[in-house]
Swiss-Prot record:
The EC number(s) this enzyme carries: 4.3.2.10
Protein name: Imidazole glycerol phosphate synthase subunit HisF
Protein family (similarity comment): Belongs to the HisA/HisF family.
Annotated organism of origin: Phocaeicola vulgatus (strain ATCC 8482 / DSM 1447 / JCM 5826 / CCUG 4940 / NBRC 14291 / NCTC 11154)
Top EC class for this record: lyase
Pathway info: Amino-acid biosynthesis; L-histidine biosynthesis; L-histidine from 5-phospho-alpha-D-ribose 1-diphosphate: step 5/9
A Gene Ontology biological process term: L-histidine biosynthetic process
Presence of the UniProt keyword Amino-acid biosynthesis in the record: yes
Cystine connections: none
Record function comment: IGPS catalyzes the conversion of PRFAR and glutamine to IGP, AICAR and glutamate. The HisF subunit catalyzes the cyclization activity that produces IGP and AICAR from PRFAR using the ammonia provided by the HisH subunit.
GO molecular function: imidazoleglycerol-phosphate synthase activity; lyase activity
The encoding gene: hisF
Amino acid sequence: MLAKRIIPCLDIKDGQTVKGTNFVNLRQAGDPVELGRTYSEQGADELVFLDITASHEGRKTFTDLVKRVAANINIPFTVGGGINELSDVDRLLNAGADKVSINSSAIRNPDLVDKIAKHFGSQVCVVAIDAKQTETGWKCYLNGGRIETDKYLFDWAKEVNNRGAGEILFTSMNHDGVKNGYANEALSTLADLLTIPVIASGGAGCMEHFRDTFAKGKADAALAASVFHFGEIKIPELKQYLCEQGINVRL
């Protein structure tokens, strides 16, 4: 069985790492280059870098910042934000990214998933899905959770799986930043539905939450931001704990 992955996420706004609760009220959380280096040294399995203003403000992800982060880490590196065409992917891979994460652009133009998978390989294409549990089910949102779409989480995840995405990064907007645990029921449904790995995002507050998302949510990887950025959970201690709980992680 593949080892479960622990993935710190850097949300970048104006060149700084920030972390909000429920997608608003952003507060600064440090220099992305320093944080990336620290996580790499601490044994994080991967790093995710999201330019959270890129899609909304039509800005291209800061290529030079990607280069600086990539130069300071030795773990797989996923970059997202404002990726709309193959040339964006090319630019970011050349800057040192290993994978790209697409979200709003995939919903607006689903063929982009097929194109990236075909041109660069499925392993490069991570489709991020921001969804919120509503009365009618899990609805997908665009532009950092600002715009509701007519797509539903499970249908959309299945579609991008079929189109050639290599992984799904699912953020529950109901759980994001609240620190009450991941959306394990929805994650477990995704795991059963899909043939590709699922990364859980939104809700980590303590080590037990990571254990539960692997055991109950059947997630392949767990992503978190604030608990790492503010030193509430240290990655070596988290991995030791998970190991003791019978979860297969890379120590």
